[in-house]
Amino acid sequence: MGILEQLELDYELEEIERFLYFFRSLCDVLEPLIVKLSSDSLKYKEALKDLEQNIHNVVWAAKRLNLDEIANFCTFCEEIMQEAAKFDGPASDEFVDWMFLVGEQLDRYCSDYEKNVSFLSVFNPQIANVPDRISK
């Protein structure tokens, strides 16, 4: 039984669809927002706000379905976005590279649900190495 099928047994379809919608929406905007982080100070702040809001939506939906691994990872990402918001920007190259790793992980997780695989993809341990320099 796949992870999506298990959710369908335990939760209302509307809740699952909302989670998948928020998750896919986040993954669809991640790359352009990450690129925007490195543009200038104004775009940096806008991108962080959009990222934080999209991530927050996934956290909310994942918690409603008791998807702790997704909720915890996205909460971690949300906290990093809040920390990054303390800087003026633009983002450092190291932070942009790290954000692309995060984006790849989120996209893998989202695809896992969409493809109804048996287990979530393995977590990339490099993500635990948050760069020291967030802003240039």
Residue ranges of predicted features:
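Non-catalytic helical tethers at domain boundaries
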Residues: 1-136
